[in-house]
Amino acid sequence: MNEPTTVLTDYALAAVSIFLGSKLVGTSKLWAVAFLALGLGAVLGGTWHGFCDNDALWKATTLSVGVASFGMVAGSALATTSGALQRLLIGFALGKMAAYCAWMLYHDDFIWVIADTGSALLIVALLHLWRFNGWMLAGVAVSVLAGLAQASGFALHERFNQNDLYHVLQTAAMFLLYRGVKR
């Protein structure tokens, strides 16, 4: 196994995301899509980091995260808006996902995953600031903190790197986002 801690923390993020996502299927299908797609991305990412760093697996990982971003934006639009604005935002989320997925078929750099997720988190934050939901805003804040920790390259230990820290922080963010969706 190449990166055992990264595999374990990625799989833990996957387990939490899939568990919480399955609990959302009956109440918020779009947020369930976000959680389940992120869970799939974490399973694939953990497998890529630990066992098999092939291109197809990486593509599937990045595309899963794009689907998760769609679910976050569309789910937030459904929860906070109505009418024409809601249709516009969901259409935007679909277009954003299609453009991202098309781009990622030919690009591998993680910066594009960050850009897509970051823009989704910004939209989610704005929507839940407008229709105030403190749990969602806390989840977005912890997600941003997780991304910054990952980008920093900071490692708590030689066997606990920035990816591992990201996974742990993002797992906490998933609980906050779940609480916000269930509110």
Please identify what each model-predicted range represents.
Residues M1-G39, G45-T61, G66-R183:
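Polytopic alpha-helical membrane-helix bundles and their juxtamembrane interface segments
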